[in-house]
């Protein structure tokens, strides 16, 4: 067994800061662990909602973020600001869209590995009628590798972006002006 040791987390963040900006935006701290410990940097813009089959722990280290939530049992969309120094535990299967509009913001997200055969999903909702436009599921092993192809497929296909309820075409990557307000 390899000898275990601690490391300075702030130094790790400083050494990986160049990866905490678009287009990558996040980095796994531990590659071979049962916990996915991810550092996420801002700014980011996203229009999808993640349906995560496990809990997610958020700790906002620097700057503020906004967690957009969708309660599928009531249809309600609402925002939870997570300020610098705040923590938040998101239950499994709560649709959420993490927004980090501030340049240089940094958050820590911790979640358990998925049980075998359990899928993650990303969903896009219509900005006009709030109906579900598209859902894509994935057997998630790597946030960095497995999610980008789902986004690319949606963004590059107008048919996938067309709302089946009102025929409005979803804007893809770019949310409407004012969608994120801290």
From Swiss-Prot:
Top-level EC class? oxidoreductase
Q: Where does Fe cation 1 bind?
A: 50, 56, 96
Q: Which cofactor does it need?
A: Fe(2+)
Keyword annotations: Dioxygenase, Iron, Metal-binding, Oxidoreductase, Pyridine nucleotide biosynthesis
A GO BP entry is: NAD biosynthetic process
Q: Which residues cross the membrane?
A: none
Gene Ontology MF, one: ferrous iron binding
Q: Which note does the record give on the cofactor? A: Binds 2 Fe(2+) ions per subunit.
In this chain, O2 is annotated as bound at 46
Reaction catalysed by this chain?
Answer: 3-hydroxyanthranilate + O2 = (2Z,4Z)-2-amino-3-carboxymuconate 6-semialdehyde
User: How does this chain assemble?
Assistant: Homodimer.
Say what the protein does.
Catalyzes the oxidative ring opening of 3-hydroxyanthranilate to 2-amino-3-carboxymuconate semialdehyde, which spontaneously cyclizes to quinolinate.
Under what name is this protein listed? 3-hydroxyanthranilate 3,4-dioxygenase
- What is the organism of origin for this protein? Brucella anthropi (strain ATCC 49188 / DSM 6882 / CCUG 24695 / JCM 21032 / LMG 3331 / NBRC 15819 / NCTC 12168 / Alc 37) (Ochrobactrum anthropi)
């Amino acid at each position: 067994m390899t000898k275990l040791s601690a490391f300075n987390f702030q130094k790790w963040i400083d050494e990986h800061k160049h990866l905490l900006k678009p287009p990558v935006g996040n980095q796994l701290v531990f590659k071979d662990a049962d916990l996915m410990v991810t550092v996420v940097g801002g700014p980011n813009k996203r229009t999808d909602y993640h349906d995560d089959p496990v809990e997610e722990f958020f700790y906002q280290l620097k700057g503020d973020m906004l967690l957009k939530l969708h309660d599928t049992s009531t249809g309600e969309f609402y925002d939870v600001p997570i300020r610098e120094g705040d923590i938040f535990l998101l239950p499994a299967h709560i649709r959420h869209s993490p927004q980090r509009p501030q340049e240089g913001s940094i958050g820590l997200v911790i979640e358990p590995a998925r049980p075998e055969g359990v899928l993650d999903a990303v969903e896009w909702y219509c900005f006009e009628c709030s109906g579900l436009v598209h859902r894509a599921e994935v057997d998630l092993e790597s946030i960095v590798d497995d999610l980008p192809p789902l986004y690319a497929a949606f963004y590059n296909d107008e048919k996938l972006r067309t709302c089946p309820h009102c025929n409005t075409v979803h804007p893809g990557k770019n949310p409407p002006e004012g969608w994120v307000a801290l």
